Amino acid sequence: MSMGQRKKAYIAFALACNVSMLLLDEPTNGLDIPSKSVFRRLLAGYVDDSRMVVISTHQVADVERLLDSIVILDNMGVALAATTQEICSKLKFGHANERARAIYTESTIAGDLSVSINDDYEDTMLNIELLFNATTANRNAIAAIFNNK
């Protein structure tokens, strides 16, 4: 069996166990693109009020639309713990138009991206990778916004 086939078998077994809390460590590593799509569909159908899934991953793009809450850890502990709704209400993500107001900026092939305080209540798409980079680069500013210590 290939790594991807073994991973699919493990995931199928885990979901079939129908446990109230399922812990998944890097669940999409080794899966091809169609299998990742199937994984997202299965996971979306699995979670309900009686079942929770905790995912540890570096492949945030594979699961970011499925998340209700995000916890970012660093060597000092919990750097951020918030719901996706809370994050999007307090922060905005996008192109760096106002660098002076940005908490964090980074240059990409698509241009400069930023995280800034959402003081004008703009509705932007959560970018977990950008959030992670902002949190690790400017932990104190993020902690102050979310009242984390």
Residue positions per predicted region:
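Catalytic Walker B motif of ABC-type/P-loop ATPase nucleotide-binding domains
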Residues: 22-26
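A short, surface-exposed alpha-helical micro-motif characterized by mixed small hydrophobic
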Residues: 63-65
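Helical segment within the ABC ATPase nucleotide-binding domain
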Residues: 36-49
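Hydrophobic anchor residue at the start of the ABC signature
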Residues: 11
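H-loop (His-switch) motif in ABC-type P-loop NTPases
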Residues: 56-58
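ABC ATPase nucleotide-binding domain "signature motif"
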Residues: 1-8, 33
